[in-house]
């Protein structure tokens, strides 16, 4: 996987799921400046800093703004520090994140998937729009898993058919299939409505 703006759609980082952040770069005078040879490192729960799996992508014509997608392994903690350094140009930028641990409503293995959907197995109760507003996180198989959960994706469920086909927003970076394992997570924005 690579940097993808699709992982910036959630209102907060979910523990052990990919998450994209914007990175501003300012020079010594406080003016926006594009970075030269970015070098981004992270620390989980006050551990030693290590190189991020991805590197900052500078937005064309951005005047000092880039973005980076942290892996699920890089968000697998209570507090995450990200330091975006450069070979020359702007000063280092520091960002802190507090990934949320959300209650698991149900877990399973998908029976199918597509760019913007995941189909629940028949063993999971499904009612029209019941899961709307909940968060789904992939945990293994295609579109999930990897070392430390590096490839896990999290999305908001925007629709649920009576047949158990969940619509998600935004579309998946890597489309799930019948090998994809998942957790459906509750949060204060989800009420199990019908």
Regions from the PLM with identified roles:
Residues 28-33, 47-48, 145-146:
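Extracellular acidic loop/turn motifs
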Residues 2-34, 39-41, 134-137, 193-194:
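Beta-strand-rich structural segments
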Residues 66-77:
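Short, hydrophobic beta-strand segments
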Residues 89-102:
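Edge beta-strands of extracellular beta-sandwich domains
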Residues 43-62, 147-148:
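Low-complexity "stalk/linker" and mucin-like segments enriched in Ser/Thr/Pro/Ala/Gly
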């Amino acid at each position: 996987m690579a940097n993808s703006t699709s992982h910036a759609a959630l209102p907060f980082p979910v523990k052990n799921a990919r998450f994209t952040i914007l990175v501003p770069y300012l020079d010594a005078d406080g003016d926006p400046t594009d970075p030269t040879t970015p070098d981004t490192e992270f620390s989980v729960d006050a551990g030693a800093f290590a190189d991020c799996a991805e590197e900052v992508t500078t937005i064309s014509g951005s005047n000092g703004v880039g973005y980076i997608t942290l892996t699920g392994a890089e968000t697998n903690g209570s507090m995450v520090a990200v330091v975006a350094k450069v070979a020359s140009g702007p000063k280092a930028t520091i960002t802190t994140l507090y990934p949320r641990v959300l209650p698991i409503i149900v877990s399973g293995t998908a029976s199918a998937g597509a760019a913007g959907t995941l189909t629940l197995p028949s063993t999971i109760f499904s009612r029209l729009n019941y899961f709307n507003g909940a968060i789904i996180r992939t945990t293994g198989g295609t579109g999930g898993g990897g070392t430390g959960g590096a490839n896990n994706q999290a999305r908001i469920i925007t629709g649920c058919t009576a047949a158990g086909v969940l619509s998600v927003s935004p579309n998946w970076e890597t489309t799930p299939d019948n090998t994809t394992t998942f957790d459906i997570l509750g949060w204060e924005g989800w009420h199990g409505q019908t």
